[in-house]
C-alpha cells in the first residue's frame, strides 16, 4: 500500500489557499496530490508532472477538471508554467524526490535490490540507456566514479573490479546478479544495511540524470512562484539535500562583494533583494517511521518567496 511520506507536514508547509494554483512536480502514486486536491475549491488548480509513463497514465485516470497531468521532466517546469499560463501565479510547488511505491514494488522496473528483475532503472523506460546497457559497457573508471560520487560508497573500487571481472564471462542482466556481485565485493563489511543500497542509488541517479534535473528545476522555480508562495522539498539522501539546502540558503541571504569591486550599485541592490524566507528542516516523527519505513531517511525543507525578482 502506498503511504505518502510526511503528508501532514507537506500540507502544513505548502499552506494551501483553496482557490490557488499548485504544482506537484513528482506525482508518483499521487498520494500528496490527492490531499492537495481535497483542500482546493472549484477554482483551484493542480498541475502534476512525472516522467514515468505509468504515473501519468494513473493521473489521467483521475476525473477531476482541476487536475492537469503533464508527462515530462520537472527540469522543464518553466516551459510548462508558460504553456499553461501560470508563470508567476503558482502558490506552491512540491518536489518529493523519492522513488514511488509502484516503482519499488514492480520488479520489472529494476529499481529494487530486494526483488529480482530486469536491470533497467529508467524513470521513463521508453527512452534512454538502461542500467543493464550501461553496467555491461561502461569502463571500470566510469563505474567506479558513479558508485563513489552518486552512492558515496567507500568500497567502490572493490565493487567495480568484481563487476568488470564477471562481465568478461557473461553479461549482467538482472538485479539479482548485480546484488550478488556487490555482496561478493563488500557484503562482509555491511551488517545492518543492505550492501547494494548505495550502488543501486548511484546507478539510478546516473541513469536518470537526477541531480542535474534537480539543479535545472531550481534555476527556474523562484520565477514561477508568486509572492508568499511556498516551495517544499522532500529528499532521501545527502546529495539531493545538499543541493536543496545550498539553493535555499543562497537565495535567502545578502550577497557580499569585495571592497571597491567595480560593480554597479543597481546590481548590488538587485542581488540583495531577499528572494526566499528559509524555514527549519523537518524530519519524520518516530510514529511515522514505525508505520512507513520509507520515511526514515526523509528530510523536508521548505521556503517562502518574499517578493518578485
UniProtKB/Swiss-Prot annotation:
Alphabetized, the UniProt keywords read: Cytoplasm, Methyltransferase, rRNA processing, S-adenosyl-L-methionine, Transferase
Some GO term, biological process aspect, for this entry: which one?
rRNA base methylation
- Reactions catalysed according to its record: cytidine(1402) in 16S rRNA + S-adenosyl-L-methionine = N(4)-methylcytidine(1402) in 16S rRNA + S-adenosyl-L-homocysteine + H(+)
InterPro entries in the record: RsmH, SAM-dep_MeTrfase_MraW_recog, SAM-dependent_MTases_sf
Per the record, its GO cellular-component terms are:
cytoplasm
Q: Where primarily located?
A: cytoplasm
> Which residues are in coiled coils?
none
Quote the subcellular location field of this record.
Cytoplasm
Pfam families found in the cross-reference section: Methyltransf_5
The record's GO molecular-function terms, alphabetically, read:
rRNA (cytosine-N4-)-methyltransferase activity
EC assignment: the record states: 2.1.1.199
Q: Is Transferase one of the keywords?
A: yes
Question: Which amino acids does the record list as binding S-adenosyl-L-methionine?
Answer: 30-32, 50, 74, 96, 103
What is the similarity comment for this entry? Belongs to the methyltransferase superfamily. RsmH family.
Q: Any idea what job this protein has? A: Specifically methylates the N4 position of cytidine in position 1402 (C1402) of 16S rRNA.
Can you name this protein?
Answer: Ribosomal RNA small subunit methyltransferase H
What species does this protein belong to? Wigglesworthia glossinidia brevipalpis
* Taxonomic lineage of the native organism: Bacteria, Pseudomonadati, Pseudomonadota, Gammaproteobacteria, Enterobacterales
